[in-house]
């Protein structure tokens, strides 16, 4: 059997392609059942996010797997395969396992090290499990992937630094104030960047978030999302003396030509710093404002510098996670090898039981004078001897099966004890039966 993943993501397909291959949440159970009915598929999990659609399967035939999965996608989405095949990637066995581990750890995400994908991987696995879509292989693999993803974030610092402009603005504010508790925030502009910044600030414990916009209705709409206070741009200028943090992202008016008004506001609040972040292009806030006493002004270039430094730090942490992934891949490979030992041990036990019974039958036929009690004693004694004789070989082959030469050890063990006839047809024993080097 083999592990395969077929998918597309933000690297291989633009958004107009990705949105055509997005599984609706309500349709996922049906999609999984359809996938599991696909020829050669034994287990299946579908991970579907805005940035990726990936189909993980355990199959019994590798050479036709790609064709079968593409056919499934063609049927489900109603899109001819010629229109999407060039956007697909396909990983097999070892590469498929490595890819899943990287996805779960956030190393394959658009934002390196993000944590949302880990929850999505777990949810996809649990959904498939409820739909009876996972078996021995994926139950082990996906649990291991989720555990590894948690370790990656708890044992490294990959998620502890801002890599978006909006979050970098918040991180910068924390450096100055230490905490947003008791702080008032004024946001100029109600666009996407302002919304993200307001979300981070509100989540960081700011007492009040005031939103000003040229269109008052839009200010009301954004303020309502964070239990904030809307106001007009003129009112915002009048409230400068009351706020601790100002984020400007209008790209139009901001507080240009208001140096004098800012200076007067600062005189009304002696010894209280005002933290200003200008994330607009062109800039909203005149650089001259930044030289006023107790005013800390930063623009988007300052924030991009922080983001780049943080990205470098995340890349360094990703190297550590890559090492963790390689270690976990070996753990999974060893586990796969141990699956092959079960039918071998069972075959040995069945052969030993057959020899034991036939030998006792022969002996009892030659000694008809033995009563039932004597026969039971002989049966227990000989079975105890047999079990003791098998104890060490069984424990040793269990250990060896999990090692690097596990497949070879199973083959040799099978030959030494002549177990071929006792093995179940198609039992996964020996080299080439379990594919994950």
Swiss-Prot record:
Record-level GO BP terms: protoporphyrinogen IX biosynthetic process from glutamate
Annotated NADP(+) binding sites: 189-194
Binding positions (substrate): 49-52, 109, 114-116, 120
GO molecular-function terms, A-Z: glutamyl-tRNA reductase activity; NADP binding
Catalysed reactions, as listed in the record: (S)-4-amino-5-oxopentanoate + tRNA(Glu) + NADP(+) = L-glutamyl-tRNA(Glu) + NADPH + H(+)
Transmembrane region(s): none
UniProt-annotated catalytic positions: 50 (nucleophile)
PROSITE patterns: GLUTR
Gene3D superfamilies according to UniProt: Glutamyl-tRNA reductase, N-terminal domain, NAD(P)-binding Rossmann-like Domain
Pfam families in the record: GlutR_dimer, GlutR_N, Shikimate_DH
Known pathway: Porphyrin-containing compound metabolism; protoporphyrin-IX biosynthesis; 5-aminolevulinate from L-glutamyl-tRNA(Glu): step 1/2
EC number: 1.2.1.70
Family annotation (PANTHER family): GLUTAMYL-TRNA REDUCTASE
Oligomeric form and interacting partners: Homodimer.
Domain comment in the entry: Possesses an unusual extended V-shaped dimeric structure with each monomer consisting of three distinct domains arranged along a curved 'spinal' alpha-helix. The N-terminal catalytic domain specifically recognizes the glutamate moiety of the substrate. The second domain is the NADPH-binding domain, and the third C-terminal domain is responsible for dimerization.
Cited function: Catalyzes the NADPH-dependent reduction of glutamyl-tRNA(Glu) to glutamate 1-semialdehyde (GSA).
HAMAP family assigned: Glu_tRNA_reductase (MF_00087)
Entry similarity comment: Belongs to the glutamyl-tRNA reductase family.
Note: During catalysis, the active site Cys acts as a nucleophile attacking the alpha-carbonyl group of tRNA-bound glutamate with the formation of a thioester intermediate between enzyme and glutamate, and the concomitant release of tRNA(Glu). The thioester intermediate is finally reduced by direct hydride transfer from NADPH, to form the product GSA.
Name of the protein: Glutamyl-tRNA reductase
Organism: Paenibacillus macerans
Gene name as annotated: hemA
